[in-house]
Amino acid sequence: MGAFLSSANSRKHPWENGEALRTDSSKKLRMSVSLYEHPRLIPWLPDEISLQILARMPRIGYLKAKMVSRSWKAAITGSELYRLRKELGVDEEWLYILMKKADDQKLVWHAFDPVSSQWQRLPLMPGISHGGGECKRGVPGLRLGDLVSAGIRISDVIRGWLGQKDLIDRIPFCGCAIGTVAGCLYVLGGFSRASAMKCVWRYDPFVNSWQEVSSMSTGRAFCKTSLLNNKLFVVGGVSNGKNGLTPLQSAEMYDPATGVWTEVPDMTFSKMQALPTAFLAELLKPIATGMTSYRGKLYVPQSLYSWPFFVDVGGEIFDPETNSWEQMPAGMGEGWPARQAGTKLSAVVDGDLYALEPSTSDRGKIKIYDPQEDTWKVTVSQVPVGDFAESESPYLLAGLLGKLHLIIKDVDNTINIMQTDCLKPMDSPAPAAGMTCQNPDVSEQETDVWKAVASKNFAAAELVSCQVLRI
């Protein structure tokens, strides 16, 4: 018995001779080699879980997170993260503002994160060259940022139809349009050496870079864009004809899934066809002055133009179900508030259509469209918007986080973003207890309607346009 116990006790355990230690070391070596060859996003965690963690990060942190490792950069710039953020309901809305620098007239983009109240400057848009409406990248000294030049508006361009084409010839680029689809920004067309371009550029916020994509079928400048059913629609604008600039009634649609442009039926401009004489038909130019996606359709207000006058002639509605245009209700089209001659801004918030109407040099009105009564109603009678005669867009509207936002520039070159929680028409019943909406009839309460959410001085820069991206 004693011999048995002695024999049993004489057996050395693995840890006594270092066998387990060597085995442990070899395992660690094999695992480290495996991790080196196939590094995980987060050590010791499956990549599926790591991706869930990255997806829940605030977007503002992705720029720095991409520098952690190559695998993190690949994950953050991949489409799977975008899909996962949307699936988890953690995608965020950011406001992207396009500005024009006063010193060199270049376009610059700035993104605003309303959650962290931080700003991010986007990389400069790539260099381009022009040849017959087509674009090529990489020509030194020629940048997409030159597309809009000081003092050039749609009204200036249309004067070219009346024998003043040299105005466009003196400006290298102007008149690009912007839009959004599938979580990316798009810059479309514009002029190059008095020729309308077909080119389209896309900014991917995950990759943080610009890329040229499929060109439009027609060269356009000052066209209107809108998003509907995950497709980017483009209508109107001007192009080059046999006798100079020609207004366009055509439209086309871009599918980001296929990268293909498809033609859409032309707008009819029926009011143009009803003109009594051929002289008036030649003198008055049909212009699409805006476009917005509203109630599952595209709404395009229109005007007839003869320098220096614009005449509102209602508008048309595109129905994607029937693939056809129909006349816009009279009250909607003829009463659509105008920002300035040739341009009508609007924003849709929680299914309601809003527009800003400048009433005096330093005041404006916010109006909401009532589809039941086919009329525009004032919701705020005093909006502090400045009068900048040389500015293309002294103020902008945007629907962000379910609220209406007003972007304005003050005399000190400070860009202010103002937000309103709730707007009711002036003739609506008083809001229920606990609601924050103010009655626009009470002047002392007007200032309480708007809340300043951000301000930043961008030196001498003009507002051009804005878009909202949710990713």
Indicate where each model-derived feature is located.
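Beta-propeller blade signature
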Residues: 107-117, 198-207, 246-259, 312-323, ...
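Internal amphipathic alpha-helical repeat/solenoid segments
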Residues: 25, 36-38, 116-119, 148-175
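Beta-propeller domains
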Residues: 100-159, 191-206
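Conserved short beta-strand element of beta-propeller blades
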Residues: 42-44, 83-102, 132-141, 164-188, ...
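CRL adaptor-proximal regions
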Residues: 1-44, 52
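Short hydrophobic alpha-helical "box" of cullin-RING ligase substrate receptors
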Residues: 41, 45-59, 64, 68-76
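Beta-propeller fold detector
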Residues: 121-127, 211-217, 262-268, 326-330, ...
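Blade-level signature of beta-propeller repeat domains, shared across WD40, Kelch, NHL, RCC1
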Residues: 409-471
